[in-house]
Structure formats: structure tokens, C-alpha cells
A protein has these predicted regions:
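C-terminal catalytic histidine-bearing segment of alpha/beta-hydrolase fold enzymes
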Residues: 246-304
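Short beta-strand element of the alpha/beta-hydrolase
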Residues: 72-81
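N-terminal cap/lid segment of alpha/beta-hydrolase-fold proteins
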Residues: 36-70
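Secreted/extracellular ectodomain signature
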Residues: 117, 165, 256, 290-389
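Alpha/beta-hydrolase active-site loop
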Residues: 130-152
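Cap/lid segment of the alpha/beta-hydrolase catalytic domain
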Residues: 83-95, 101, 111-137
Length: 389
């Protein structure tokens, strides 16, 4: 994952050609060239899937997490967001918490990097201020990937759910207008596209939502929070009202405030308590697998997350107790890492951090206690200070 909220990460920043026909051919990428180690326990692999065009083609970097066995498995597609700046510097998206959720329920999880992002070839198609067109262009990449996946013996082409966060949520809603065979439902986590330089961007977003809803027949589930740094309550409620105005079936889960920025809910430890029960109920309504049948893919933390405290603001480096200059620099580096994450410290100045899929609270404490004489405690988890003086 990258380091901006458009792709479910840590620090909140504000983000300021013709139709292609989808054909697909998959080739394994040399895993040795990947900076991120593949998770063998989750059967993680990386493919390139060729999106054929009339003139040009693009090769789409796609991550697959697959249950052990031959299938066929229901399919969950998870669409990434967009960082500000050059999208080629955006790292491969690995929503491990969500991947584990679906693997436990027997799904194969498909995570495509769209055209121009990360190691995918081609150029990101911006479409200027036309937010509706932007979403559809992104959705063409999702179509190409699904055309490949549904041709594989391991995939159940009649049981598909498509999800996305931020720009990926917007891509998911746009993809819904294709009414792709076998897709049962859509899940939108804080979806949208914000173009502050395009005048009335909110009106553009609302009008595009209305257009998407008028063309979509499958149900959708929407998640938005009140303190979302991109799409506040007025905006997301207008979007939802417009989307459903023509009869589209979309249920809005407005979960209020969460942490420093509700835009990050999908990837946060606290957020899973919001979205996972709702998504399970949604899958049940769609007639899709929703109960845990493969618990070996779970990743329970052995260290519970303490409650948020009012000890200090998250980004107040000078308020972090005990640590010296090197420790403050380490805390600053921690703030630039992805969720889930944890930072621990001890009265003797020892400190450590950990981030990523495998129990960051325990790893941070274990590392800290190597020098902390067993006195280390958690200072921050995700975007919450949990230190009690």
C-alpha cells in the first residue's frame, strides 16, 4: 500500500483514449523483483493481465490471494485508491486485513493495479474534470481483470463481489454500470474523486453518482464517516440520494466519527469492527458465502488494542515521553507507515514500532522489550494515541 489516504494508508493528505476492449493473458511477474515479500500462508501471487485495446494494450499488475485447493471459489475484487502525484510511484496494493476476511470465507481475492499505477503499464487516464468518465475508464481495467479471472477453473464466475476504497470505491460504483455477469453486489468504502480545481466538484460528483445509479441493477453497500477528510456528511449524503433517486438499491452505513480521519476506516484495526459485520450481512443477503469456513487464514492479535487516550495529539513529536532524538525520529517514521501499525516505548528510553499484517502490537512490544527490560507499553496504534500516563 502507499502512504496516502486514497489507498487506505496512514497520513491524511488532500488530493487535489477511447474505449478499450478487454482481453486477458496472464503471466507471472518475477517475484524476486518485488520489494514486498509474498505471503505464502495466503497463497499470494502476482500476475500481469493484458488489457487489449484497439491500438494499444496495457499490462495490469494483479495480486491474487487464493484458498488452498482447486475451487471453484467465489471471487472478491478489491480496488485501490489514488495517491496525489505521479501514480507510478504508488506501491502495489496489499489489503491484507480484507484479504484474510474473504479467504476465511472461501473467496479468491483479486487486487488489480489499474493502468499507469505501480508496475502496470500504460498511462493513468484522468478524463480532466469529467468525474463520471474517469470512473468508467478505471472500471474498464477491472473488467479486463475479471475477464481473465472468470476464465480460470478456480473461479466461480457466478459468485462475484466487487469492493473498493476511495478512488477504488468510485471505480467500483462505475463498474456497477456494466452489470457484469455474475457480479452479485458492490461495496463502496468512502468512494469518490475530488477535483478541487474543477469548480463545483461536489455537484459533478453528485451528478455522476446519479448517472451511475440509473444504470446499475445490483445492490451496493456504502460506508462513509463524518470526519472523512475528502467527502464529508453533506457530500456523501447527496451522492447517496442521487445514486438511489432512480431506484438503485444502495444502503448507506454512516458510521459517524472514527479516529483522526474516517477516510482510513477500511484499513484500520478499529474500522474492521464497523465494516466486517456489515459486509457479512450483505454477503448473506446476496446469497454468497458469509460465514468463516477456513479459520486458518485469520490473524488474531495476541495483544488487545488499548482505548484511545487524550495524552497528546498523534503528531505531537515533542509530547512522546522518555525517548530521545533518535526515538522521536523513529516515531516520525512510524507515522509514515501503513495501517495496521503500533509504536511502543519504555521509561528507560527504549522504543520500537511495527506495521503490516502480522500482529503489529505484539511485534512492537517484543522489539521494544529487548532493551526495555519488560517495561514497554504501547504509545500509539494506527492513528490513536493509547498511552496512559
Amino acid at each position: 500500500m502507499g502512504k496516502f489516504p486514497g489507498i487506505s494508508t496512514t497520513i491524511a493528505f488532500r488530493a487535489a483514449t477511447g474505449a478499450l476492449r478487454a482481453g486477458a493473458l496472464a503471466l507471472l511477474i518475477n517475484a524476486g523483483a518485488e520489494a514486498q515479500e509474498l505471503n505464502q500462508a495466503l497463497n499470494e501471487t502476482i500476475l500481469t493481465i493484458t488489457k487489449e485495446g484497439i491500438v494499444f494494450s496495457a499490462k495490469l499488475e494483479t495480486t491474487i490471494f487464493k484458498p488452498t485447493g482447486s475451487g471453484p471459489f467465489p471471487v472478491a475484487v478489491i480496488n485501490h485508491g489514488k495517491s496525489p502525484g505521479d501514480v507510478r510511484y504508488q506501491g502495489r496494493y496489499r489489503p491484507l486485513m480484507a484479504a484474510r476476511y474473504f479467504l476465511q470465507r472461501g473467496y479468491v481475492v483479486v487486487v488489480p493495479m489499474r493502468q499507469g499505477f505501480s508496475n502496470s503499464t500504460g498511462n493513468y487516464i484522468d478524463a480532466g474534470c469529467n468525474i463520471e468518465s474517469n470512473g468508467r475508464e478505471q472500471a474498464e481495467d477491472v473488467r479486463a481483470v475479471l475477464d481473465y479471472v472468470t476464465a480460470q477453473a478456480y473461479a466461480d464466475r457466478n459468485k462475484i463481489v466487487v469492493l473498493g476504497q476511495s478512488h477504488g470505491g468510485w471505480t467500483t460504483l462505475a463498474f456497477g454500470t456494466f452489470n457484469y455477469p455474475g457480479v452479485r453486489g458492490l461495496v463502496n468504502f468512502a468512494g469518490g474523486l475530488r477535483h478541487d480545481s474543477c469548480g463545483p466538484w461536489t455537484a459533478n460528483l453528485v451528478n455522476a453518482s446519479r448517472s451511475y445509479g440509473a444504470k446499475t441493477v445490483v445492490p451496493s453497500l456504502w460506508f462513509y464517516g463524518d470526519n472523512d477528510s475528502y467527502f464529508g456528511p453533506t457530500t456523501f449524503r447527496l451522492m447517496h440520494a442521487a445514486y438511489t433517486s432512480g431506484g438503485a438499491n444502495a444502503r448507506l452505513v454512516a458510521f459517524g466519527k472514527l479516529g483522526r480521519d474516517a477516510h482510513l476506516m477500511f484499513s484500520s484495526l478499529a474500522g474492521r469492527e464497523i465494516w466486517q459485520p456489515e459486509v457479512s450481512a450483505f454477503l448473506r443477503q446476496l446469497g454468497l458465502p458469509h460465514e468463516v469456513t477456513q479459520p486458518q487464514y485469520a490473524n488474531p492479535s495476541s495483544v488487545p488494542v488499548p482505548p484511545r487516550t487524550d495524552f497528546a495529539p498523534l503528531y505531537a513529536l515533542d509530547s512522546v515521553p522518555y525517548v530521545r532524538e533518535k526515538g522521536r525520529a523513529g516515531y516520525a517514521a512510524f507515522l509514515a507507515t501503513d495501517f495496521p501499525r503500533a509504536f511502543a516505548l519504555a521509561p528507560n528510553g527504549a522504543w520500537a514500532s511495527a506495521s503490516g499484517d502480522t500482529d503489529p502490537q505484539k511485534r512492537a512490544l517484543d522489539r521494544c522489550n529487548k532493551d526495555g527490560q519488560g517495561a514497554c507499553k504501547l504509545y500509539a496504534v494506527d492513528d490513536a494515541v493509547v498511552w496512559a500516563n
